């Protein structure tokens, strides 16, 4: 009887120990599950952060592409402005050459007109001198008449030349007037071109400042991309570490669950053994 009691006490003690171990296993399993859930939550959080970083990186790359496109457009605008400036300078040069040729033609026509006027004046003075003398000598008169005829002929020729010169002068004056109009137009155009050049110069300065700012923004974007890439790699490393931790915790949970099942089976075996012992005692 004492042996049975001792056996029962031992079995009870073993049962209590099994219960304690089962409770401990259950608590450890719950703790492991909590740690696994926490690790999974951290992994999900890291995954969200990685997604956010990837989105930020995509946005930054898109902004960088837009900045590069704007910079290309500004380069094209700068090239167009330089071409316009070159064309305007060429037009100014052509206008100046045209004005210079017109001034030369005007100077030549003025000199010819002065020569014709001087010849006409000399002929007229000679005629008046011959008339005032009143020479009686017929031969002298004939000579004078011949001289007068020559003078008249010269005067007529001079008149013709004068008319021709006057006609040419009128043409030259018309050309001069048109040249002056073109010169005035050219001057006003030069003023407009100078204003356009000033505006183009300001635009060039603005483009240079914009290009410098764009370069600074590009450097900032590159630095930001570098920082985001580093953060992405760090987040991926943390995610991999968290995933390994989750796998490790899951293995620990599986081990504790297996141990719990084993303890429960052991506890059931002890209970069955106690029941059998009680049945034998009652039967005796």
UniProtKB/Swiss-Prot annotation:
Coiled-coil ranges from the UniProt annotation: 1-284
The keyword Coiled coil belongs to this UniProt entry's keyword annotation: yes
Family: Belongs to the tropomyosin family.
The protein's assembly and partners: Homodimer.
Biological function: Tropomyosin, in association with the troponin complex, plays a central role in the calcium dependent regulation of muscle contraction.
InterPro entries according to UniProt: Tropomyosin (IPR000533)
Key words of the record: Coiled coil, Repeat
Organism: Periplaneta fuliginosa
The name this protein goes by in its record: Tropomyosin
Domain-related comment: The molecule is in a coiled coil structure that is formed by 2 polypeptide chains. The sequence exhibits a prominent seven-residues periodicity.
Pfam families: Tropomyosin
């Amino acid at each position: 009887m004492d042996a049975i009691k001792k056996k029962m006490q031992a079995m009870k003690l073993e049962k209590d120990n099994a219960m304690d171990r089962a409770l401990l296993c259950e608590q450890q399993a719950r703790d492991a599950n909590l740690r696994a859930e926490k690790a999974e939550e951290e992994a999900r959080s890291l995954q969200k952060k990685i997604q956010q970083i990837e989105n930020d990186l995509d946005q930054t790359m898109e902004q960088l592409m837009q900045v590069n496109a704007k910079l290309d457009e500004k380069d094209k605008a700068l090239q167009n402005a330089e071409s316009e400036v070159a064309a305007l300078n060429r037009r100014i040069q052509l206008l100046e050459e045209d004005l210079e040729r017109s001034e030369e033609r005007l100077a030549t026509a003025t000199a010819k007109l002065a020569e014709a006027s001087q010849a006409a004046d000399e002929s007229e003075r000679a005629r008046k001198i011959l008339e005032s003398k009143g020479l009686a000598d017929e031969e002298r008169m004939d000579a004078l008449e011949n001289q007068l005829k020559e003078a008249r002929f010269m005067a007529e020729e001079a008149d013709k030349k004068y008319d021709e010169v006057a006609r040419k002068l009128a043409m030259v004056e018309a050309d001069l007037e048109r040249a002056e109009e073109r010169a005035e137009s050219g001057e006003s155009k030069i003023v407009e071109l100078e204003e356009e050049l000033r505006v183009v110069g300001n635009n060039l300065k603005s483009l240079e400042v914009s290009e410098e700012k764009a370069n600074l923004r590009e450097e900032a974007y590159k630095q930001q991309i570098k920082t985001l890439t580093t953060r992405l790699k760090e987040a991926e490393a943390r995610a991999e570490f968290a995933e390994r931790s989750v796998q490790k915790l899951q293995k620990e949970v599986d081990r504790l669950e297996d141990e719990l099942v084993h303890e429960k089976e052991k506890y059931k075996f002890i209970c069955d053994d106690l029941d059998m012992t009680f049945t034998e005692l009652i039967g005796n």
